[in-house]
Swiss-Prot record:
Protein's GO biological process: response to zinc ion
The organism's taxonomic lineage, starting at the top: Bacteria, Pseudomonadati, Pseudomonadota, Gammaproteobacteria, Pasteurellales
Protein name: Zinc import ATP-binding protein ZnuC
Cell inner membrane as UniProt keyword: yes
Entries under InterPro entries matching the protein: AAA+_ATPase, ABC_transporter-like_ATP-bd, Metal_Ion_Import_ABC, P-loop_NTPase
Protein function: Part of the ABC transporter complex ZnuABC involved in zinc import. Responsible for energy coupling to the transport system.
Keyword Iron-sulfur: no
UniProt organism field: Haemophilus influenzae (strain 86-028NP)
Matches recorded under Pfam families: ABC_tran
Family from the record: Belongs to the ABC transporter superfamily. Zinc importer (TC 3.A.1.15.5) family.
Length: 268
C-alpha cells in the first residue's frame, strides 16, 4: 500500500520519502514494502500491535536502523526533533532540567529559556530530572526536541501510561507546538484506536501498512461529550480499522477477507 500524507500546496516536496522499505532481522520480517511520503505541516499517527514494526519504522527514518532494502530520501532542509518513548537516567548522578537541555550541541541559554516558556515549564528549570512526574518528563523531552526549531517532530508513544485526560492535554500541547513551529508531526501511538484528533492520516502497521484513514472526531458524538467534556473531545479522535486481511500471532498474513477489521496486540 502506498501512502501519501496530505500535500501542502505551497510546499509540494516531501520532507522525507520512504520507498519500498524492508527490514529483516535473522530471517524475521520487521517491515515489508513500506512506502510513505511525509509532507510539510502534515500530522501522521502510526498505530499497530506490539512487535508490528512501529518502532523499527521510526528507527529507520531516524537513521538508527539501516533498511535491508529500499531507501529513505531526505529533503535538504529537513530538521528533525525527536521525542523518545522514555530515557534512562542514573539516579546517582542528579541533573537539572536546564543542564539536561544544555547538553544539546550548539544551544544557547536564551534558546532554552524560550523553549521552556513555550511549553509552560519555566518553573521546572532548576528541578531535578530524576524527580519529575511522567507528564513533566514528557514536556521536558518535547522542549528538548524543539530546541533546533524542527520542521518535522517525531514522537515515539508519547501518551503511553497516560490516562485519557492526560492524553487530551498532551495532544493539545503537541497541536499548539505544531502550530507555533509550523512543522510536520509523525507520532507513534500505543493505542490501536484512540489517536490525536488533528491527525490528517492514521496508518496501521503490522509489518506492512494494513490500512490507513482519518480519525473520527469525537466532538461530534454527544454521548462522549457528556462523559468526558469538551477539552478531551476536541483533542482525541477514534480510528476505525478497515483491514482486508488477517495476521497470525507471528504477524504473517493468513488470507484476505473483506470483513477483517481486527488488529490484536501480541507480545514483543
Amino acid at each position: 500500500m502506498n501512502i501519501t500524507a496530505i500535500r501542502n500546496e505551497q510546499n509540494p516536496q516531501p520532507l522525507i520519502q520512504l520507498k519500498n522499505i524492508n527490514v529483516v532481522f535473522a530471517q524475521k520480517t520487521a517491515l515489508q514494502d513500506i512506502n510513505l511520503n511525509i509532507y510539510p505541516n502534515s500530522i501522521i499517527t502510526i498505530v499497530g500491535p506490539n512487535g508490528g514494526g512501529k518502532s523499527t519504522l521510526l528507527k529507520t527514518l531516524l537513521k538508527l536502523q539501516m533498511p535491508t532494502s529500499g531507501e529513505v530520501i531526505y529533503s535538504k532542509n529537513v530538521r528533525i526533533g525527536y521525542v523518545p518513548q522514555k530515557i534512562h537516567l542514573d539516579h546517582s548522578l542528579p541533573i537539572t532540567v536546564e543542564r539536561f537541555l544544555s547538553l544539546k550541541k550548539g544551544i544557547k541559554t536564551q534558546e532554552i529559556s524560550t523553549a521552556l516558556e513555550q511549553l509552560s515549564i519555566s518553573h521546572l528549570r532548576k528541578s531535578n530530572m530524576q524527580k519529575l512526574s511522567g507528564g513533566e518528563m514528557q514536556r521536558v523531552l518535547l522542549t528538548r526536541a524543539i530546541l533546533n526549531k524542527p520542521n518535522l517532530l517525531v514522537l515515539d508513544e508519547p501518551t503511553q501510561g497516560v490516562d485519557i485526560t492526560g492524553q487530551a492535554e498532551l495532544y493539545q500541547l503537541i497541536h499548539q507546538t505544531q502550530q507555533k513551529l509550523n512543522c510536520a508531526v509523525l507520532m507513534v501511538s500505543h493505542d490501536l484506536h484512540i489517536v490525536m484528533a488533528d491527525s490528517k492520516e492514521v496508518l496501521c502497521i503490522n509489518q506492512h501498512i494494513c490500512c490507513a484513514g482519518t480519525p473520527d472526531v469525537l466532538s461530534n458524538d454527544p454521548t462522549f461529550m457528556r462523559l468526558w467534556g469538551n477539552q478531551i473531545a476536541q483533542n482525541v479522535g477514534f480510528y476505525t480499522h478497515h483491514h482486508n486481511h488477517h495476521h497470525t500471532l507471528h504477524g504473517d498474513v493468513c488470507g484476505c477477507n473483506s470483513s477483517a477489521v481486527h488488529c490484536q496486540n501480541k507480545d514483543k
